[in-house]
Amino acid sequence: MTFRSLALPLLLAAAGSAHAVEVPIGDFFKDPEFKNVSLSPSGEYITVSVPQGDRTVLAAFRVADMQLVGKWDYGEKKHIDEVVWVNDERFFMYVSRKLGRFDFHVGTPDVYASNVDGTKRMDVPNGGTYSIRALTPDDPSNIVVERSSGLGDTVLSKLNVYNGQVRTIATVAIFDADFVVTDDGEPMYAHGTEKDLTQVTMRRAGDNKWTTIHTSNESGSEHVPRRMHGDGERVVFEVSKAGEPMQVVLMDPATGESTPLSSNPNVESTNFLTSSDRKDLLAVRYHDGIPNYDFVDETHPESLTYAGLINAFPDLAVAFPGISWDGKKVLVYAYSDVDPGSYYLFDRETGKAKFLLAGREWIKPEQMSEMKPIVVTARDGRKLHGYITIPRDSDGRDLPLILHPHGGPHGPRDGWGFNPEVQFLANRGFAVLQINFRGSGGYGTAFEQSGYRKWGTAMIDDMTDAVDWAIREGIADKDRICTYGASYGGYAALQTVVREPTKYQCTIGYVGVYDIPLMFKDGDIPQSDWGRNYLRKVHPETLAEQQAQSPAFNIDRIRIPVMLVHGEKDERVPMSQYDRLHDGLVKAGRPPEMIVLEDKEGHGFYDLQNQVDLYTKMEAFLDRHIGDGAAAPVSP
């Protein structure tokens, strides 16, 4: 790892032009050297998550000389996903177990506390059930945390970060609540989701009793308290009347009046940028095409600093993962569609930025392909946002196209930034189409819920409409189109073919769901109340409808070459899903090409050699059917 000191005007070097170069597959998929940098409250230290195959370890560095001061490793399949500094010498680590590259954590994460030099390590009792609600700089031994009791309510407590002792502050009768607290940790509001997914907002009155002020069932609207204003009286809410993207408002509880602060007609906020003393809301971040900030307080000194830093990186998206508590040091992350990103530490007193780390220094932006935001109109008039990536140095006309739906599907979305799979496919000459179909997250509750019970119908039609757009625009050759996705994207890759049997020349399903009724019986989702409620909410009620939306029950409509990829250790989408589709295709006399790893891999492959083997075979498969190796269009 290298570091250097740079003045702001010299932060960016102009990239020279370059002809398309075939980049080795391993360069796209090998782990970054680091990710998830966090800054200590003094700005003296950083922590860095370091992926190492089937685990992610943590390292701490002293910023002045980038010397290692501590390292933490919790073993195989354990990943240190998040670090939260609780005072200037100590932080919490959230350690989860994951069984695949596309997996969310399995079970409740473990939480450990440690000093930055590795001393005074502690297993935080029940730590994975806690969410940190507030830090208390005036009381560095304690933080304010919340956790669901398991009895239908949520408890707010003070937690001693050195001995793990807990003292209850308040309890609210909401199953899974987030509290809004004052600077000294006193709860004022609570908002959460009940087991039936109803949203509830409550306010704490002067007599310490909680009063319900809003429920989503009664109003059909959303009314979510986010944080107290710096005056200690008014409250920042996000509100939506009919499921449209929520707008940020400042509410005065004394009068009930709300003042608009920020909104975007297309997307919801992704996070808030606050002052170093955490009192003032400075800006709201949106991911509308390319990520950006909307400053709500343009005159605050720290807002001026942030705006200047954004202007210093004109061709990159800029995020601010941390600021020292005295406001003097700002952690800056700058990245783009062709640049995996670098971290800098900006000193507000000197006006200079020190380069800290770049996670994938071997990636050359001038060899990558531009990802362009697009807007597509669906057949029912709904506006769909997405991205098209055109191979570098191509003329962008009549290209072989990969429709690449994202996983999830509810909550996640595709965004602008460096995507190894997309860049690999573009580097091999394929245009890549990503569309945020209805059901995707980030575009408001109404948009997300419009995909419920329509996994295999309207959501798929959105993808088809996006492909038709690419054909009309002259980007895609209509006789050279394949689909590829993972998890829900793997399901969609097959269901697009079921719904449009003659439109595609091949399809690839990676750890995909292919039998919706089986989701209610197998895998880790139906093992929890939340998971069972989720399945009932997003899938059709009748077995016949579920089967109609399942590729495994529509084998007769899948008449093109299929590749299936799965890991035998997958708990999110178990091998039974793969078996249902594979066996059906074999019985129909159309056996798929298959990659099944039986030993270590789960919901997405971790091992680099396994990934290289997978994408090598994928490249050959795509080339045979829509690439240079395709002798003629494949007839269904």
Language model regions located:
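Bacterial N-terminal signal peptides
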Residues: 7-15
